[in-house]
Design a protein with these regions (language model features):
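Short beta-strand segments
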Residues: 14-49, 57, 63-67, 76-80
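Short, surface-exposed beta-strand-loop junctions and turns on beta-sheet-rich folds
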Residues: 51-53, 72, 134-136
């Protein structure tokens, strides 16, 4: 397996991740759309201002995520642990990138840009899984 090649393929094909947080030993997970900046190894996602997960980020910025496969029955995925923080970029700064990844996202951005805050996930390693027997940890 060419793990890095598979990492980039999966991270670019998938539209959503399951983002896991934990506060006071109480785990929480939610589905978010994302855009991955390959040049800087940063994953961006946007959420509405005032959502519960934002307060969780301030209390504990350690996160984990897994990509959600696009095809039913497919188990391939990218998993990683990292840190989340508020981005200096706005949703309008990343409008083109998000829109290229998810065509209907441009309408959401245009309607709700003032209500959306961008966050970024930074991570240095990921586990690339093709199936239950084929997986590999990579450094980025």
């Amino acid at each position: 397996m060419e793990a890095k090649k598979e990492f980039f393929r999966m991270i670019n094909e998938c539209d959503e991740i399951a983002l896991a947080t934990s506060i006071h030993d109480m785990p929480n997970v939610r589905i978010v759309n994302y855009y991955y900046d390959q040049d800087n190894n940063i994953m961006y996602f946007a959420t509405y201002i005032g959502r519960e997960k934002i307060s969780e980020f301030w209390k504990n910025n350690n996160i984990a995520f897994t990509t959600i496969p696009m095809k039913k029955g497919i188990r391939e995925q990218v998993r990683a642990r990292g840190h989340v923080r508020e981005s200096e970029k706005s949703i309008m700064d990343l409008r083109e990138e998000f829109s290229n990844k998810m065509s209907d996202f441009a309408d959401i951005i245009d309607k709700y840009s003032k209500e959306l805050k961008v966050y970024e996930i930074r991570f240095t390693e990921a586990t690339v899984t093709l199936d239950s027997r084929t997986y590999e940890k990579i450094s980025l």
